[in-house]
A protein has these predicted regions:
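PLP-dependent amino-acid enzyme catalytic core
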Residues: 1-401
Length: 401
């Protein structure tokens, strides 16, 4: 049974292992509330996961330690298990979905774990880990549906209350539910009036649906670039804890998450992965009743693959009106490109790339598509460019994407 004493004990065990990460105010991220960031993206291994993994492994018997540990993870729990096991001289095997970010896979190997890549999602990796556990007799370290893991994650709740005693609400990312279960239990046990909200990706709303439909359930499929919360099945223990201690769970879109990552980079100089950014996305896009409140967004991790980050930045720029892609139908005659360029210039925008495409079979031979990528200030400037091009007689075939 989870108790506050167990969370305090976890905090004692972790005091020389996990950092007490900073809680920083972020006034540029929200004008509607007093927003703070709990920077677990700056934690050891770049994620909160080391807390639960280390505490769980620290409580194993000698017999269990001698046999070793096995885990499944999209990346962050893998690194936490690898670090904890290596520090305590224990063999570790981690099953990871083959689509896990390369950086997380390599970091897990570098921390001393044997990595087994499994085709499919986190849930497929979980099934493989259970199979290997039965074959080897190693102890399975569940990433979220485990009382000691939850207690380890709950230490973040203790730290938030210590760092901001008059906090009104805490927003937490949700995958399987281990993090929010621990944080909510700790906070509600000490200050029941503090609101605890969860956020899931719109494409992976397993806990959201379970709580809103009052029925524990597994999704047929999930899809989100926020790999840390890409979970089909929430934990059974975490579901019960969320039912009792979590005030509400909302979802955010991929575009909203991308915009939050970009905003954290530009305004706070912080790199967050998709899962770590969803609480900020919920605040930025007004998903929760937090106006005028002191609010903590738990930035759970910063382990984002650089290739994904590049695409996320591009999407975030488009979402914020800082980048636009326009496709214009032109008559293939001299002066058309110059006229378009002049209009864009007069509106104060910069052309990043130009593609003159006459190969579309649906276009007349005498016509072509002009595809532009523009650097813009905001959505208002994009609309101004559209209007000026239309006024000049140009046909916009496709606008921002």
């Amino acid at each position: 049974m989870l108790t506050l004493d167990k969370i305090y004990h976890a905090a004692f065990v972790l005091k020389d292992v996990a950092r007490k990460t900073d809680l920083i105010e972020a006034p540029r991220l929200s004008k509607d509330c007093q927003l703070y960031l709990k920077t677990e993206n700056l934690q050891v291994t770049g994620s909160f996961k080391v807390r639960g993994a280390y505490y769980k492994i620290s409580q194993l018997s000698k017999e269990e330690r001698d046999k070793g540990v096995i885990a499944c993870s999209a990346g962050n729990h893998a690194q936490g298990v690898a670090l904890a096991a290596t520090r305590r001289g224990i063999k570790s095997i981690v099953c990871m979905p083959d689509g896990a970010p390369i950086m997380k896979v390599e970091n897990t190997k570098n921390l001393g774990a044997e990595v087994c890549l499994v085709p499919g999602t986190y849930d497929d990796a979980h099934d493989k880990a259970v199979e290997l556990q039965e074959e080897t007799g190693m102890t399975f370290i569940h990433p979220y549906d485990d009382e000691q893991v939850i207690a380890g994650q709950g230490t973040i709740g203790l730290e938030i209350l210590d760092q901001l005693p008059d906090v009104d609400a805490v927003i937490v990312p949700v995958g399987g539910g281990g993090l929010i279960s621990g944080v909510a239990f700790a906070i509600k046990s000490l200050k029941p009036d503090v609101k605890v909200y969860g956020v899931q990706a719109e494409g992976a709303p397993s806990m959201y649906r379970s709580l809103h439909e009052h029925k524990y359930q597994t999704l047929n499929a999930v899809s989100t670039f926020a790999d840390g919360i890409q979970v089909k099945t929430p934990g059974e223990l975490t579901y019960k804890l969320c039912e009792e201690y979590v005030d509400d769970i909302v979802t955010v879109t991929e575009d909203e998450t991308a915009a939050a990552i970009l905003s954290l980079m530009e305004n706070q100089k912080l790199v967050a992965e998709g899962a770590g950014a969803v609480p900020v996305a919920a605040a930025l896009f007004h998903k929760l009743p937090i106006e005028g409140k002191k609010v903590v967004c738990l930035v759970s991790g910063g382990n984002i693959d650089v290739n994904i980050l590049n695409r996320v930045i591009t999407r975030g720029l488009v979402m914020s009106g800082r980048k636009a892609n326009l496709t214009i139908a032109l008559e293939d005659k001299p002066g058309q490109l110059q006229q378009v360029a002049d209009i864009v210039s007069r509106c104060g925008s910069n052309v990043v790339s130009v593609l003159h495409d006459g190969s579309d079979p649906n276009m007349p031979i005498s016509s072509c598509f002009l595809k532009l990528t523009l650097e813009t200030r905001d959505n208002a400037q994009i609309e101004q460019i559209r209007q000026e091009l239309t006024k000049a007689g140009f046909q916009l075939v496709a606008e921002r994407v």
